């Protein structure tokens, strides 16, 4: 029996055989046989006519067979109802699985062993004590945390003879180094008080493993996530190793200080004598507030693959790519260790950034399960590396440039990692094999005349739809959404993604089906259009894969592509689905001569070959290479069989579920890590909206081959989401209690005026709401002070006003002028050097109860003379050498110390003074000391006018004067207890202006520090 149509293929052969088998075993009805016998005497009567009547059960067998086939086809055929059900199921599964993967409740189990429970309990108790008060480096709370840690660590170390503690007491370990990262470009002097613990291993020949975290916080934060969690995890590790057998490998713990404003503690540790033992490291950090700890970065594939030993791995090299390409504007101690040649990992909390560095980074906004996730990951990794010899031990001294970077990801506690070379090799294979195999199959299809009516109209529909939809999506995003509510992503990133995703799918649905209506009379215009869309999507992914492969093969810092592991996976899924379609056409019988309709008969029913409901929504698709109705018109050639195929189902299951999950999971991970950075700059805002558009487009592509058959229910649902989204965009608050507006505060007292000015500055995005909040402060309204707004560029503004609220930073200090005084011990007029020689300056800076000052050397006085006699401002500082004296000596023969014999970089003179020389110029000197009351005593040498190579340096006006600006910071926010004149105790806020802002700001505002402290005092002098 032959059937009319163009739709059968080889993939559906089993279905065809099933239909034939049922047809062959189906009994003929008695009346029909009699009629045939009577009408055609030449045909003998059917034997069945002489057989006794069948039983009722035998007669119902055909009905049961027909019912089974109908059910099978109605469920698995290419019908709108079936497709709609699967699409809805994929959406639900994607959202649910992605949420569960990032959820602590569903992906992390609490410890079950008594030992781990005890370790976690003590670690949580330690975290509570660390976070009892704010403890920035410039606060007394920092000393309290240091004292607690030292006592607790000492008690643990005492339990084992092979454990030892080293403390940098009283600033005995003094270092100087240049700090050049992010916005920092300075030379720093630092007195370390790190707490360093060594757990000596049984095999001293093995290189040591470093575990590092910092115990300081920013002035406005309790430092729970940043970085109390890391410190508590390290205490948990020490607790563990103080109660188990000696590890094979030595483990060194660096509890370092003052990370927040220059990574000082980690940098100082490089000078520690134990550092030379170390080859590997694990850095514990927090750039968010709670949640799950994610593997941010890894130095290379060799060390990253050992992260598979972790029981609850949570990782994505997308963050590594973001860090390496400077999309994330923060740094961790990881960067110090990697520059020192170590190999290791950066494990950190990553969201949300609007709570990060604010008072909301507290115990109440985290939980013990977050701590357990970081602690368990640290415990597993450290135990794995320290308990055995690993393969990396043989290549400890391998050059960093020769190490292969890693691409990695995780899902539901399964960790996957590949090296760059492995991915590049696999990508090249895919780039070559897939096109060759596809062309071979296409050659067979067209060479053997399989009847695929591919033409220009088929090819152009999808690109037209894609381009038109992208243009409309961009217009809606940039012209409608951004102007109406630009900061919406801060609070409602899901709403925005859902709205734009619905819009993009609907646009493609309308355009593609609209083109089908326009070309309805065109022969073959719908011939297997889903396969054509798959092929074109596969081609686009192939181009993306080619670009990614080229970039990966030349991967470098600043142009990193190690987060693109998903690209070859998505391309492979697209390619497999296309192969299925091509194979179906290859096994399809060749075209035959058209025969009359009367020669054909339905397989199972005289009513037609289309089973199931005849409603348009549930009709079997006529647009599949393997569909039940692949003929488009009566002019279509006839084939040997008509197969009721289900290739669409296989293709759907190959492409859509996995692709949707990978794309959504990766995209949501990035957005959750970046969306709060919209408050940090206009460029960050543009980046986020651009990424949302890319995310929506990429997430839609797996669904587009099947967009033609979307049920009206899905279309209605998408329309409702779109309408609600457009409505909600205009009424949803960008900032609320859960997603606060983040403002940054600094109060600056300038000694350059008389009386001193007391100025509050607040930095934030340029928006009216900030102005309204500040102008509503009682002190502004009472003093009738005018708010000044200055642009900082990149969408940021500086809001400033003079405040009558005087800070109380130090007990006993009543006058603002007592906070900073400068003694000039030596200036340019005190030496007889020629204008072309080095001039020397020496200062004593007196500041009570202070730990941090910054000195900027004025570059505006220095010009460079070029050959065309024009003058231009030099960006180089005239200062070449700085010295920090250990003792408070006012008469120091610095000229004999600072001379031509001083080496570049950091050195110490014969008296132990710290010297740093940089012939490129020193524009800023950061001073960090541990003694609260000791003055700063510094010296420096500069070049007022000198010939170096082709450049001539000279002063603009004051040939022998150097501008020096001193700014000192206080960061303590605890209340100050004093006694009044009558001897009664009086408690005062240290920074009343900040407390006023905290008290009167709306609940949707969170406050952070602008700089190294909450209050700074400045003074400008010339020497």
From Swiss-Prot:
Entry's EC annotation: 3.4.-.-
Matches recorded under SUPFAM superfamilies: Zn-dependent exopeptidases
Cofactor: Zn(2+)
Vacuolar topology ranges: 102-425, 483-491, 551-564, 665-687, 734-1023
Biased composition (Polar residues): 17-48, 604-613
MF (Gene Ontology): metal ion binding; metalloexopeptidase activity
Bilayer topology annotation: Multi-pass membrane protein
Stretches assigned to the Cytoplasmic side: 1-80, 447-461, 513-529, 586-643, 709-712
Segments passing through the bilayer: 81-101, 426-446, 462-482, 492-512, 530-550, 565-585, 644-664, 688-708, 713-733
Cofactor binding note: Binds 2 Zn(2+) ions per subunit.
Protein location: Vacuole membrane
Active site: 259 (proton acceptor)
Enzyme type, top EC level: hydrolase
GO cellular component terms, A-Z: vacuolar membrane
Site (Transition state stabilizer): 356
Disordered as annotated region, ranges: 17-59, 604-626
GO biological process: proteolysis
Residues listed as glycosylation sites in the UniProt record: 170, 200, 490, 675, 815, 858, 892
Keyword check for Membrane: yes
Positions bound to Zn(2+) 2: 226, 260, 357
Keywords: Glycoprotein, Hydrolase, Membrane, Metal-binding, Metalloprotease, Protease, Transmembrane, Transmembrane helix, Vacuole, Zinc
Pfam families cross-referenced by the UniProt entry: Peptidase_M28 (PF04389), PFF1_C (PF22250), PFF1_TM (PF22251)
Major localisation: membrane
Function according to Swiss-Prot or TrEMBL: May be involved in vacuolar sorting and osmoregulation.
UniProt record similarity statement: Belongs to the peptidase M28 family.
Protein name: Vacuolar membrane protease
């Amino acid at each position: 029996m032959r059937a009319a149509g163009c739709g059968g293929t080889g993939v559906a052969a089993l279905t065809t055989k099933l239909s034939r088998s049922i047809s062959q075993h189906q009994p003929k009805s008695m009346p029909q046989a009699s009629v045939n016998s009577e009408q055609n005497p030449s045909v003998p009567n059917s034997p069945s006519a002489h057989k006794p009547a069948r039983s009722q059960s035998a007669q119902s067998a055909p009905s049961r067979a027909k019912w089974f086939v109908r059910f099978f086809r109605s469920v698995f055929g290419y019908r709108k109802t079936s497709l709609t059900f699967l699409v809805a199921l994929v959406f639900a599964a994607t959202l649910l699985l992605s949420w569960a993967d990032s959820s602590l409740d569903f992906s992390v189990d609490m410890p079950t062993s008594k030992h781990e429970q005890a370790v976690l309990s003590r670690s949580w108790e330690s975290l509570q004590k660390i976070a009892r008060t704010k403890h920035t480096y410039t606060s007394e709370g920092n000393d309290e945390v240091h004292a607690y840690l030292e006592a607790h660590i000492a008690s643990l170390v005492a339990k084992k003879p092979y454990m030892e503690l080293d403390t940098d007491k009283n600033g005995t370990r003094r270092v100087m180094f240049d700090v050049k990262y992010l916005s920092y470009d300075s030379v720093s002097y630092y007195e370390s008080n790190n707490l360093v613990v060594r757990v000596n291993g049984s095999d001293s020949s093995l290189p040591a493993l470093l575990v590092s975290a910092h115990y300081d916080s920013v002035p406005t934060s309790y430092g729970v996530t940043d970085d109390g969690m890391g410190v508590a995890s390290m205490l948990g590790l020490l607790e563990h190793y103080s109660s188990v057998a000696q590890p094979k490998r030595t483990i060194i713990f660096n509890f370092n200080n003052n990370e927040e404003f220059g990574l000082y503690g980690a940098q100082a540790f490089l000078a520690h004598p134990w550092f030379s033992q170390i080859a590997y490291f694990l850095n514990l950090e927090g750039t968010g507030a709670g949640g799950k700890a994610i593997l941010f970065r890894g130095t290379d594939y060799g060390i990253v693959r050992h992260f598979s030993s972790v029981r609850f791995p949570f990782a994505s090299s997308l963050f590594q790519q973001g860090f390496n390409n400077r999309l994330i504007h923060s740094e961790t101690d990881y960067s110090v260790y990697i520059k020192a040649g170590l190999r290791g990992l950066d494990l950190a909390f990553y969201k949300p950034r609007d709570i990060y560095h604010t008072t909301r980074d507290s115990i109440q906004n985290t939980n013990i399960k977050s701590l357990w996730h970081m602690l368990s990951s640290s415990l597993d990794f450290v135990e794995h590396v320290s308990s055995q010899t690993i393969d990396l031990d043989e290549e400890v001294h391998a050059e960093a440039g020769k190490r292969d970077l890693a691409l990695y990801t995780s899902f539901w506690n399964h960790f996957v990692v590949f090296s760059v070379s492995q991915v590049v090799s696999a990508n090249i294979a895919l780039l070559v094999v897939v096109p060759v195999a596809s062309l071979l199959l296409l050659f067979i299809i067209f060479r053997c005349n399989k009847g695929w009516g591919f033409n220009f109209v088929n090819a152009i529909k999808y690109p037209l739809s894609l381009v038109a939809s992208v243009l409309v999506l961009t217009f809606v995003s940039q012209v409608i959404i951004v102007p109406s509510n630009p900061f919406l992503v801060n609070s409602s990133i899901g709403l925005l993604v859902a709205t734009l995703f619905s819009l993009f799918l609907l646009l493609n649905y309308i355009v593609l089906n609209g083109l089908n209506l326009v070309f309805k009379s065109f022969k073959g215009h719908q011939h297997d259009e889903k396969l054509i869309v798959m092929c074109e999507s596969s081609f686009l992914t192939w181009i993306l894969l080619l670009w990614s492969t080229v970039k990966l093969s030349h991967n470098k810092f600043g142009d990193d592509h190690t987060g693109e592991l998903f690209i070859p996976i998505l391309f492979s899924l697209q390619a497999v689905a296309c192969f299925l379609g091509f194979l179906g056409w290859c096994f399809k019988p060749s075209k035959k001569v058209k025969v009359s309709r009367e020669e054909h008969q339905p397989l199972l029913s005289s009513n037609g070959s289309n089973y199931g409901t005849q409603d348009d929504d549930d009709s079997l698709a006529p647009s599949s290479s393997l569909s039940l109705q692949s003929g488009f018109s009566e002019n279509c050639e006839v084939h040997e069989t008509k197969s009721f195929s289900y290739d669409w189902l296989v293709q759907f299951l190959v492409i859509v579920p996995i692709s949707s999950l990978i794309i959504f999971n990766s995209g949501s991970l990035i957005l959750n890590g970046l969306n709060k950075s919209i408050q940090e700059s206009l460029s960050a805002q543009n980046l986020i909206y651009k990424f949302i558009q890319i995310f929506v487009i990429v997430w839609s592509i797996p669904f587009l081959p099947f967009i033609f058959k979307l049920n009206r229910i899905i279309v209605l649902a998408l329309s409702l989401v779109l309408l609600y989204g457009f409505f909600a965009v205009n009424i949803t608050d960008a900032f609320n209690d859960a997603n606060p507006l983040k403002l940054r505060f600094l109060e600056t007292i300038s000694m350059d005026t008389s009386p001193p000015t007391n100025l509050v500055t607040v930095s934030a995005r340029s928006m009216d709401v900030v102005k309204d909040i500040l102008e509503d402060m009682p002190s502004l309204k009472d003093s009738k002070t005018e708010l000044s707004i200055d642009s900082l560029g990149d969408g940021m503004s500086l809001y400033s006003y003079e405040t009558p609220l005087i800070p109380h930073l130090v007990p006993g200090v009543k006058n603002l002028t007592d906070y900073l005084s400068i003694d000039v011990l030596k200036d340019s007029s005190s030496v007889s050097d020629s204008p072309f020689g080095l001039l020397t300056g020496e200062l004593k800076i007196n500041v009570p109860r202070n730990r941090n000052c910054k000195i900027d050397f004025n570059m505006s006085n220095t010009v460079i003379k070029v050959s065309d006699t024009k003058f231009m401002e030099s960006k180089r500082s005239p200062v070449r050498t700085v010295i920090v004296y250990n003792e408070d000596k006012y008469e120091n023969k610095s000229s004999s110390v600072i001379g031509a014999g001083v080496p570049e970089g950091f050195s110490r003179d014969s008296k132990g003074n710290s010297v740093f020389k940089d012939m490129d110029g020193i524009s800023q000197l950061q001073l960090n000391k541990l003694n609260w009351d000791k003055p700063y005593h510094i010296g420096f040498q500069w070049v007022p006018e000198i010939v170096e190579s082709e450049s001539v340096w000279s002063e603009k006006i004051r040939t022998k004067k150097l501008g020096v600006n001193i700014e000192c910071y206080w960061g303590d926010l605890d209340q100050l207890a004093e006694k009044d004149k009558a001897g009664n105790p009086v408690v005062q806020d240290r920074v009343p202006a900040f407390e006023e802002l905290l008290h009167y700001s709306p609940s949707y505002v969170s406050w952070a520090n602008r700089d190294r402290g909450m209050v700074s005092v400045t003074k400008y002098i010339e020497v």
